[in-house]
């Protein structure tokens, strides 16, 4: 499933892998994870993603937030506070996010 440009979700049983190859943060913020692939509960057990900000790298994770009857995904760079670096359009995500669903 293509979630955004340069962002693909793959499912193998209960294992979900989201691959990023230079996905722009703003595009990822607009993406929707299919309901059958939501983490249950909304906790991601593994992460291995990198946010590229100019020449700097920031490890980070993906956060799911409810928005009506869907979940919207946000990239949160190396912090518990999503506002620290924001989800600006020039930021790009590289790597993979892996998690399990119930």
Question: What residues fall within each predicted segment?
Answer:
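Terminal (often C-terminal
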Residues: 1-13
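Extracellular jelly-roll beta-sandwich "head" domains, especially the C-terminal globular C1q domain
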Residues: 3-6, 25-35, 44-102
């Amino acid at each position: 499933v293509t979630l955004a440009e340069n962002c693909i979700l793959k499912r193998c049983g209960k294992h979900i892998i989201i691959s990023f190859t230079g996905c722009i943060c703003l595009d990822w913020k607009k993406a929707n994870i299919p309901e059958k692939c939501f983490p249950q509960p909304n906790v991601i057990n593994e992460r291995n993603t990198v946010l590229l900000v100019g020449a700097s790298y920031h490890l980070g994770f993906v956060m799911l937030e409810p928005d009506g009857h869907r979940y919207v995904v946000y990239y949160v760079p190396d912090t518990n506070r999503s506002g620290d670096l924001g989800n600006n359009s020039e930021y790009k995500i590289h790597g993979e996010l892996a998690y399990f669903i119930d």
